[in-house]
Amino acid sequence: MDLNLRKAIYSNISNNDEQQLEATIVDAIQNGEEKMLPGLGVLFELIWKHSDDQEKKEMIQSLESGVKQL
């Protein structure tokens, strides 16, 4: 069976507005279930692909800061 996770996630969120997308992200993080990690990864990939260099730099800096707090 060939499951294309990206396509499934894109299909699930394709009609979502900003509030629904935010709720999806917040719920996945607060829930803390590992099964949600691939979905968050796909969402991050979309964000990354649609960000300019400055936004990417800010995300990396934020990530570095968060990693240092672990």
UniProtKB/Swiss-Prot annotation:
Matches recorded under InterPro entries: SspI
Inducing stimuli: Expressed only in the forespore compartment of sporulating cells.
Pfam families the record matches: SSPI (PF14098)
Keyword Lipoprotein (UniProt): no
Principal location listed in the UniProt entry: other
Domain of life: Bacteria
Biological process terms in GO annotation: asexual sporulation; sporulation resulting in formation of a cellular spore
Keywords attached to this entry: Sporulation
Keyword Chaperone: no
Location(s) in or outside the cell: Spore core
Family stated for the protein in its record: Belongs to the SspI family.
UniProt protein name: Small, acid-soluble spore protein I
Originating organism: Oceanobacillus iheyensis (strain DSM 14371 / CIP 107618 / JCM 11309 / KCTC 3954 / HTE831)
